Amino acid sequence: MARRCDICGKGPLVGNNVSHANNKSKTRSLPNLRSVRATVDGTVKHVRVCTRCLKAGKVVKVAHGASRASARA
């Protein structure tokens, strides 16, 4: 499973750790992803969303057990 936000597409960044002797080793900076139950096209799905999209309100979270309550009614 890719470490990528399902909403904005944010993924890992690649860079270098540079020592005083100018030796370089690769480093990866991963996005802060959360697995969230959200409504997508009217259905409840698990999506991986970065915290920036969560704070911006781009995702409508579903309360735990809400899909079962609607199925009973």
Swiss-Prot record:
Keywords: Ribonucleoprotein, Ribosomal protein. Belongs to the bacterial ribosomal protein bL28 family. This is Large ribosomal subunit protein bL28. Transmembrane segments: none annotated. InterPro entries: Bacterial_rp_bL28, Ribosomal_bL28, Ribosomal_bL28/bL31-like_sf, Ribosomal_bL28_bact-type, Ribosomal_bL28_sf. One of its GO terms (biological process) is translation. It holds the Pfam family Ribosomal_L28. It comes from Anaeromyxobacter sp. (strain Fw109-5). One of its GO terms (molecular function) is structural constituent of ribosome. One of its GO terms (cellular component) is ribonucleoprotein complex. The keyword Cytoplasm does not apply. It comes from the Bacteria. Gene3D superfamilies: Ribosomal protein L28/L24 (2.30.170.40).
